A protein has these predicted regions:
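N-terminal accessory/interface modules of nucleic-acid-binding and processing proteins
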Residues: 1-191
């Protein structure tokens, strides 16, 4: 806010300001902001599938009895008919993390890469306020990091975060787009 005037070296009168708020440029760099407080199931699922590199298909039964399953060979995520919205969102979050893992690191081994992917999915679920029912992967933390030095551990944690962030950023863009379309439609009805 203005806090008096002063005369500069060149003789020009200028206004002195008292700074109330300081922002880091990284705080202003984001082109969109989603309203996370009460995301609907539709918004979350729309966000997860937004600009997805793979397709989704409903089936009666998936391989291995899983309710949601990514098939790298078919570039398809299969999901079982009649799932609860919470199970569907949690499963999609996990499987899109498998898709992102494959995108970043190549072939996916569901056994070997499960800890990294499930950890990333857990982070993603927490970011999107998706309830998580299965946290069994947390029991594997000690075994997974055993024998790694601090540099390797840090790199693995960074990789987990990278997977979660990539899926989260795409989902947030999709949710933001959906919210903007809804807000624009609501404004159009008010006119």
């Amino acid at each position: 806010e203005p806090k008096g005037e002063y005369q500069g070296n060149d003789g020009v009168i200028r206004t002195n300001y008292d700074v109330k708020y300081v922002f880091d440029i990284s705080q202003l760099n984001r082109p969109y902001r989603i309203k996370k407080q009460n995301l609907s199931v539709r918004e979350i699922i729309s966000g997860l599938v937004y600009q997805s590199p793979v397709k989704m298909q409903m089936v009666d039964n998936t391989e291995n009895g899983s309710l949601v399953q990514y098939s790298p060979d078919n570039q398809m995520i299969y999901y079982a008919d009649g799932m609860s919205p919470t199970d569907l969102m949690e499963g999609l979050a996990r499987e899109y993390c498998y898709v992102e893992f494959e995108s970043q690191y190549g072939n996916v081994d569901r056994t070997e890469d499960a800890f990294m992917v499930k950890s990333a999915a857990y982070i993603l679920c927490k970011k999107l306020n998706i309830p998580v029912s299965n946290v069994d992967f947390a029991n594997e933390v000690k075994n997974y990091f055993e024998g790694m030095d601090s540099r390797d551990t840090k790199e693995e944690l960074s990789n987990i975060k990278s997977i979660a962030d990539e899926v989260s950023n795409r989902a947030e863009r999709g949710i933001y787009r959906l919210q903007q379309e809804r807000d624009n439609a609501n404004r159009g009805e008010e006119r």
